[in-house]
């Protein structure tokens, strides 16, 4: 079991284990999930991606999704893994496979009422559990801003989802001289958008410093 970010970082470092011939399950529906799925596929594995909502709610850019499917990633929509099952050899406690992933327990979902963001909430379909055999699980689930930032920064305005409120053009927050951008402001998005926000903030900071006596 590995996070998508850890996996992609390992690829860059050249330390990723051999995926050749393995069955890989990716959990998530964002752009990072697509990156992880396509990367694992190119490393020689069979990749299945599980997302608990429908195609309409899937947050990844459609271009990323289309490329993943074209390359051979299999989608399992309205499917939510709830438990990872490990391998254990009762006859040999020293078996090197002990503790490795052998399968996931997955439950099928149905769409219920919309949540606060307007997306219909996924609810479990009773009695729909099934076992999916896999050799590796890549977790590519959404993240939220570190609550430590808002909890330790007095006067910093945040929205109801915990994102920092910042000026769209300058990145300046409710605290003069404090700037923010990227996922901490917008929620899950792309690296390109985060880089753009950083550039705008840098320009605003430069202008502010030039005006400082």
Where are these regions (language model features)?
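Rossmann-like NAD(P)H-binding beta-loop-alpha module
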Residues: 16-45
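FAD-site-proximal beta/loop scaffold in flavoenzymes
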Residues: 2-22, 115-188
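Cofactor-binding loop segments of dinucleotide-utilizing enzymes, especially the Rossmann-like FAD-
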Residues: 29, 52-54, 183
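General small-molecule cofactor/ligand-binding pocket signal
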Residues: 2, 74-76, 105, 179
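A structured beta-alpha segment of the ubiquitous adenosine-cofactor-binding alpha/beta core
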Residues: 13-15, 78-135
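A conserved FAD-binding loop/helix module that cradles the flavin
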Residues: 36, 181-212
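Rossmann-like dinucleotide-binding cores of NAD(P)H-dependent redox enzymes
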Residues: 37-83, 213
């Amino acid at each position: 079991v590995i996070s998508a970010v850890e996996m992609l970082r390992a690829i860059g470092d050249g330390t990723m284990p051999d995926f050749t011939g393995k069955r890989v399950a990716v959990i998530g529906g964002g752009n990072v999930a697509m990156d992880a799925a396509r990367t694992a596929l190119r490393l020689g594995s069979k990749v299945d991606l599980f997302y608990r909502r429908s195609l309409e709610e899937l947050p990844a850019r459609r271009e990323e999704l289309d490329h993943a499917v074209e390359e051979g990633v299999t989608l399992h929509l309205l499917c939510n893994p709830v438990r990872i099952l490990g391998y254990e050899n009762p006859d040999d406690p020293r078996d090197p496979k002990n503790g490795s992933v052998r399968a996931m327990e997955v439950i099928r979902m149905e769409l219920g009422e919309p949540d606060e963001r307007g997306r219909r909430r996924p609810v479990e379909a009773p009695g729909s559990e099934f076992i999916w055999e896999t050799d590796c699980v890549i977790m590519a689930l959404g993240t939220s801003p570190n609550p430590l930032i808002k909890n330790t920064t007095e006067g910093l305005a945040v929205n109801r989802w915990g994102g920092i409120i910042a000026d769209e053009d300058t990145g300046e927050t409710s605290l003069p001289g404090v700037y923010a951008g990227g996922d901490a402001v917008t929620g899950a998005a792309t690296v390109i958008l985060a880089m753009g926000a950083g550039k705008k903030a840098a320009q605003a900071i430069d202008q502010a410093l030039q005006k400082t006596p």
